[in-house]
Amino acid sequence: MSNENLSPNSSNPDLTKLNNGESGTIDTSKFSPNEMKLYKMYGKLPSKKDIFKHTMQKRKYFDSGDYALQKAGIQNNDPINYGKNNLPLTNPSKLREDIIKRRISTCPSTASTAGVVDNATLIQKEGSISSGPPSSNNGTIGGGSTSSTPVGNHSSSSSSLYTESPIR
């Protein structure tokens, strides 16, 4: 070979002289600019145009978890549709329906039959923070009467500040 500059950045290398012992010559006049650049850099063109798509088609497993599950003989029975490259395609409406069904099935008021609520559920609802203050009926939670004893080590003279008056 001659002392030509054959780097990928060189402006005018003669690629027809670079047949590397092949019997045929390469017609570079039909190459696109991108193909010409690749040929200058690597001396040949890649066999597949879309390399990423080609590698994804060869791939059997999405990740190591899928590989381990198949080796263990466990089949995934999820109703998820898979595309050509085995990536899950989500169905937003189906996902919303599943979430709503799950929430309804775990709700304690719908778990009881025909609107009959048992006492444990009623007490749990009354004692919860989100239900608000307890009702003012006779069945108060926590003993019934309020205590007006002073808190801490105070003298008995300070107990006159704490009178038994209902808060209304």
Curated annotation (Swiss-Prot):
Pfam families: Endosulfine (PF04667). Residues 17-31 have a biased composition (Polar residues). GO terms for cellular component: cytoplasm; nucleus; P-body. GO terms for molecular function: protein phosphatase inhibitor activity; protein serine/threonine phosphatase inhibitor activity. Interacts with RIM15, DHH1, PBP1, PBP4 and LSM12. Belongs to the endosulfine family. This is mRNA stability protein IGO1. The lineage of its organism: Eukaryota, Fungi, Dikarya, Ascomycota, Saccharomycotina. The gene is IGO1.
